[in-house]
């Protein structure tokens, strides 16, 4: 929604009404719904580092390695329940794979030295 136009002081027209200064209100708590906090992101990252991946996540990464994106999506959908969650999981796993490849290349270069 756009911000309403300034009132004109007239009692007719689109912007009719008494002229007042709008109060600046603090943001409501539910306006941040769906946004993960820095702490939550840190904790999830830490848990992922310690616990590793679930078996179905490992299978998805294996399917993505051989280029079977559609099969990976189907596996994720069956495990997670909805198409939207499955797509998000597939993207997450492919980004993990990309990071592993980029780090793997750097690690291989260090081993050669």
Swiss-Prot record:
Per its UniProt record, what PROSITE patterns does this chain match? Answer: RIBOSOMAL_L36E
Composition bias, kind Basic residues: at what positions? 78-88
Q: Which organism is it from?
A: Arabidopsis thaliana
Q: Which GO molecular-function terms appear in the entry?
A: structural constituent of ribosome
Stretch list, region Disordered: 78-113
- Which keywords does UniProt give here? Ribonucleoprotein, Ribosomal protein
Gene Ontology cellular-component terms listed: cytosolic large ribosomal subunit; endoplasmic reticulum
Q: Does the keyword Ribosomal protein apply?
A: yes
Q: Which GO terms describe its biological process?
A: translation
Q: Which Pfam families match?
A: Ribosomal_L36e
Q: What is this protein called?
A: Large ribosomal subunit protein eL36z
Per the record, the similarity remark reads: Belongs to the eukaryotic ribosomal protein eL36 family.
Gene3D superfamilies given in the database record: 60S ribosomal protein L36
